[in-house]
Amino acid sequence: MIKLTHISKVFQQGSRTITALSDVSLHVPAGQIYGVIGASGAGKSTLIRCANMLERPTSGQVLVDDQDLTTLSEGQLTRARRQIGMIFQHFNLLSSRTVYGNIALPLELDNTSRADIKKRVNELLDLVGLTDKQDAYPANLSGGQKQRVAIARALASNPKVLLCDEATSALDPATTRSILELLKDINRRLGLTILLITHEMDVVKRICDQVAVISEGKLIEKDSVSEVFSHPKTPLAQQFIQSTLHLDIPEDYAKRMSPEPTVDHVPLLKLEFTGKSVDAPLISQAVRRFNIDIGILSSQMDYAGGVKFGVMLAELHGDVQDGLAAIKFLQDHHVKVEVLGYV
């Protein structure tokens, strides 16, 4: 549905040349939710703006529904954009218009009849759960309600594609979850293709089918969400994944933790499980096989792309050599083991 091929974008700022995107290629299949994740300044927003030609690439090809947008005239591009909805971080609603009026605006600009506008707007109000807010103004809405209005407005022309530019970044966690569930529901019910950019792996984890990681304008990793979470290939992908698992070392442990082993201290381990290692009884097997004890301080498990993954903080008690053998056993079974210190 969306094919970006060898996209590069160069900006000139006085005598400076800034390369925002460098030879980026990705394919978003019809009906899928595709996430692009990266840190601030990585080129995410430039990439998504190239997808509907709000930003014209310096080089490369943009195909949406098999139509090459880079070859179109301004008039042709305006018509093509009717098949591409877009929502933004800051909603961009018209403060002088009601919820109904904001959603109706694209249809009015397209000279749709008043009866058809009313029918379509009422359908969209029902879809986004705002039937009781049609006469309200943006100033009287919460952030989540404003984004729901923006989503409804983006869907007014029955687009085949929805672009989401950091659509949940300005929202609190609970509201973020509700907006993500709405996007997932819209994708499922309408078969809508969604390309979203974000700096939060939690967003990717919750709703995306595939993910690409962008850094300094280059696409450094892309695959299904389950594959990236199970077998991240780049340090940046690993960093984003770790950010979704929030396990802190207890304060009393942190105070007494030593970076070097001593006689009366034991290793404090961070264990990361992905894929099949999550369900396997590896801890109990290691305890029995190597005559050690493992004291679990805390653990967390989650899902991404249908695959379970988890993290655990644990103390390792026993003979040093037995402990090293146990660590190797866990590593051989695809558990990432990190010695955080000695407590």
From Swiss-Prot:
Residues 2-241 form the ABC transporter domain. It is an enzyme of class 7 (translocase). The keyword Translocase applies. Its EC number is 7.4.2.11. InterPro entries: AAA+_ATPase, ABC_MetN_proteobac, ABC_transporter-like_ATP-bd, ABC_transporter-like_CS, ACT-like_dom_sf, MetN_ABC, MetN_ABC_transporter-like, NIL_domain. Its main location: membrane. Belongs to the ABC transporter superfamily. Methionine importer (TC 3.A.1.24) family. The complex is composed of two ATP-binding proteins (MetN), two transmembrane proteins (MetI) and a solute-binding protein (MetQ). This is Methionine import ATP-binding protein MetN 1. NCBIfam families: ABC_MetN. Part of the ABC transporter complex MetNIQ involved in methionine import. Responsible for energy coupling to the transport system. It catalyses: L-methionine(out) + ATP + H2O = L-methionine(in) + ADP + phosphate + H(+); D-methionine(out) + ATP + H2O = D-methionine(in) + ADP + phosphate + H(+). The lineage of its organism: Bacteria, Pseudomonadati, Pseudomonadota, Gammaproteobacteria, Enterobacterales. It is a peripheral membrane protein. Pfam families: ABC_tran (PF00005), NIL (PF09383). It is found in: Cell inner membrane. One of its GO terms (cellular component) is Gram-negative-bacterium-type cell wall. Keywords: Amino-acid transport, ATP-binding, Cell inner membrane, Cell membrane, Membrane, Nucleotide-binding, Translocase, Transport. Coiled coil: none annotated. One of its GO terms (molecular function) is ABC-type D-methionine transporter activity. It comes from the Bacteria. ATP binds at G38, A39, S40, G41, A42, G43, K44, S45.
